[in-house]
């Protein structure tokens, strides 16, 4: 952690700018989860459940 602090001081980056950047990065991760990961997961679960039902009903005939 000390190395990062020294890097910020040497690069003349303010703590406010570093904080804003970190908040933006976390916000991007949350947005990606909401827009991509969660819908894709729900779709894959839905498809796998339907496939399981189709295989089960086909096997009984």
From Swiss-Prot:
Membrane topology classification: Single-pass membrane protein
Cellular component GO terms held in the UniProt record: photosystem II; plasma membrane-derived thylakoid membrane
Highest taxon above the source species: Bacteria
Single Gene Ontology BP annotation: photosynthesis
Disulfide bond entries: none
Keywords annotated in UniProt: Membrane, Photosynthesis, Photosystem II, Thylakoid, Transmembrane, Transmembrane helix
Localization per record: Cellular thylakoid membrane
Residue intervals passing through the bilayer: 26-46
Listed HAMAP family: PSII_PsbX_2
Family to which this protein belongs: Belongs to the PsbX family. Type 2 subfamily.
Protein task: Involved in the binding and/or turnover of quinones at the Q(B) site of Photosystem II.
Protein name: Photosystem II reaction center X protein
